[in-house]
């Protein structure tokens, strides 16, 4: 039964998602162990040598030094970036594999299978090095057959932009994610999708909005409490709190013009 399912994985900068096609031919987003549709792309190395991935890692991040928490590893895929944890070195491939493995294991546990085949999405502008690294991460995570598909193509298929037999169309896909931004023009001929042009900024996404909010929060905290910004910079707990809270604040500001929050400094 290992080949009963072929899964699709959106390996994202800030959140990742897994889906499959059910017996009726409908796409189903798989819930992880925490009963969430998406898994935070966060990795925590605790003091016992455990590698924790997803919401538990994100929730506990504030309790650990920043160097034991890895986020946005997708931005480093295909590079020689390394993380040293207790003398062990982890690459973007092995770190990405940890995220993939968590989602795959949750799927296997939910369905009582051992899935070995998957389609993993990547930005259209990824070169061969990044694509190969993503595929290798899938293999390290336990997959045997990994296919890489461009994110704009996956989005077009998902939203039903396919053309009928003999029909042609051109669409533009705007993809603003947690860590990357790109716009791709696709030519669709029946079931064939061809990227005509793509451009964007690989270091622009939701996390950068978070960083702007962090800067604003720091300024306001310092102004209203007559403290130096260096006091915030030297406090790891404050920095971790700002990283976590900025995302929550950003979400609130998506539907409100203002919001409030708390920040404990030196307490």
What are these regions (language model features)?
Residues 1-79, 83-85, 89, 105-267:
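Oxyanion-binding/catalytic loops of NTP- or PPi-dependent enzymes
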Residues 88-98:
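Conserved AMP-binding/adenylate-forming core of the ANL superfamily
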């Amino acid at each position: 039964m290992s080949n009963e399912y072929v899964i699709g994985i959106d390996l994202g900068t800030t959140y990742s998602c897994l889906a499959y096609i059910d017996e009726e031919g409908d796409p189903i987003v798989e819930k992880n162990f925490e009963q969430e549709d998406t898994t935070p792309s966060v990795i925590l190395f605790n003091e016992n040598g455990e590698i924790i991935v997803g919401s538990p890692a994100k929730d506990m991040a504030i309790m650990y030094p920043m160097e034991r928490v890895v986020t946005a590893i997708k931005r480093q895929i295909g590079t020689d970036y390394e993380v040293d944890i207790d003398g062990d070195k982890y690459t973007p491939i092995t770190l990405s594999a940890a995220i993939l493995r968590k989602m795959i294991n949750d799927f296997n546990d939910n369905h009582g299978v051992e899935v070995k085949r998957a389609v993993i999405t990547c930005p259209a502008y990824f070169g061969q090095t990044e694509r190969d690294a993503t595929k290798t991460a899938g293999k390290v995570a336990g997959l045997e057959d990994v296919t890489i598909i461009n994110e704009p193509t996956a989005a077009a298929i998902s939203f039903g932009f396919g053309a009928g037999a003999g029909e042609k169309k051109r669409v533009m896909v705007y993809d603003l994610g947690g860590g990357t931004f790109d716009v791709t023009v696709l030519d669709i001929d029946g079931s064939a999708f061809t990227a005509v042009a793509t451009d964007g900024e690989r270091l622009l996404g939701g996390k950068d909005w978070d960083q702007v909010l962090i800067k604003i929060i720091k300024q306001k905290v310092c102004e209203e409490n007559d403290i130096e910004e260096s006091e915030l910079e030297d406090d790891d707990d404050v920095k971790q709190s700002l990283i976590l809270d900025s995302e929550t604040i950003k979400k609130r500001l998506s539907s409100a013009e203002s919001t409030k929050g708390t920040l404990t400094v030196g307490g």
